[in-house]
């Protein structure tokens, strides 16, 4: 598997990576709207921004679940790679630093590529984006996750609906299951049939379980009925 690791020189974390001397591939494009597509998989290091400014280390897939976009195309999800994302996340969880660690729900672009993209991010302010020791620690954990992904335990390969953006429930499930796309509660009311199908189709590993985190019965029924022919397990919380 040809896994390409990239950063953008337009991105604050990318600039720190360059200063550290890592020989990853450098792009000069918007980190949420790039067109780069080489290898079999792309792992992207970038900054994470949030209004709360809470320090964090996060992983997620790109995708715009509804018409509103942040780079990429509307109603388009990227390609998921559950065992690789989960392997990276499990190594990040081992970092002995008091900082939030989470799998984020699917959001922002790019969505143009036909291969999996996984974002590995540092949040949520300049203080952390430019912290060379923290950036180095995150890179080393990510590289360990890449090395181990073929051997990790995956009781199930799941997609998730509901919960908040930082997905505490699905992040917890990643201790034993491998995680594909997660659609947070904020998008569910506007979610099209097409995007629901993409959650299980846009992946290079077969999904076997759909998890719901406090989703109302009407939306839950819509999703279950639409995915009924896929022979999936449905679990509710």
UniProtKB/Swiss-Prot annotation:
Task: Output the InterPro entries linked to this UniProt entry.
Answer: Deacylase_DtdA_archaea, DtdA
The UniProt GO MF terms for this protein read: D-aminoacyl-tRNA deacylase activity; zinc ion binding
Q: What is its EC number?
A: 3.1.1.96
One of its Pfam families is tRNA_deacylase
Top EC category: hydrolase
Q: Which UniProt keywords apply?
A: Hydrolase, Metal-binding, Zinc
Free-text comment on the cofactor: Binds 2 Zn(2+) ions per subunit.
Record flagged with keyword Ion transport? no
Q: List cofactor names only.
A: Zn(2+)
Which GO annotations describe the biological process of this protein? D-amino acid catabolic process
Reaction catalysis annotation: a D-aminoacyl-tRNA + H2O = a tRNA + a D-alpha-amino acid + H(+); glycyl-tRNA(Ala) + H2O = tRNA(Ala) + glycine + H(+)
The record's listing under Gene3D superfamilies reads:
AF0625-like (3.40.630.50)
HAMAP family in the cross-refs: Deacylase_DtdA
**Free-text function comment from the UniProt entry:** D-aminoacyl-tRNA deacylase with broad substrate specificity. By recycling D-aminoacyl-tRNA to D-amino acids and free tRNA molecules, this enzyme counteracts the toxicity associated with the formation of D-aminoacyl-tRNA entities in vivo.
- NCBIfam families linked: PRK03995.1-1
Q: Which family does it belong to?
A: Belongs to the DtdA deacylase family.
Summarize the subunit comment.
Monomer.
| Name of this protein | D-aminoacyl-tRNA deacylase
Classification of source organism: Archaea, Thermoproteota, Thermoprotei, Sulfolobales, Sulfolobaceae
């Amino acid at each position: 598997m040809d896994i390409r690791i990239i950063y953008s020189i337009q991105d604050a974390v990318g600039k720190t990576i360059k200063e550290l001397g890592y020989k990853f591939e450098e792009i000069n494009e918007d980190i949420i709207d790039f067109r780069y597509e080489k290898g079999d998989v792309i792992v992207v290091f970038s900054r994470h921004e949030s209004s709360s400014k809470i320090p964090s280390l996060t992983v997620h897939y790109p995708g715009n679940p509804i018409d509103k976009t942040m780079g990429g195309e509307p109603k388009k999800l990227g390609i998921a790679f559950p065992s690789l994302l989960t392997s990276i996340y499990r190594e990040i969880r081992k970092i002995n630093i008091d900082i939030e660690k989470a799998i984020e729900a699917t959001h922002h672009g790019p969505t143009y590529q036909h291969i999996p993209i996984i974002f590995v991010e540092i949040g949520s302010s300049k203080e952390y984006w430019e912290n060379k020791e923290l950036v180095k620690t995150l890179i080393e954990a990510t590289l360990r996750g890449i090395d181990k992904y073929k051997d990790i335990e995956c009781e199930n390969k799941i997609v998730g609906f509901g919960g908040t953006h930082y997905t505490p429930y699905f992040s917890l499930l990643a201790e034993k299951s491998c995680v594909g796309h997660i659609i947070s509660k904020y998008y569910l009311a506007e979610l099209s049939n097409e995007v629901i199908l993409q959650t299980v189709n846009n992946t290079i590993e077969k999904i076997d379980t759909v998890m719901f985190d406090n989703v109302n019965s009407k939306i839950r029924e819509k999703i279950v009925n639409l995915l009924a022919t896929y022979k999936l397990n449905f679990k509710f919380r």
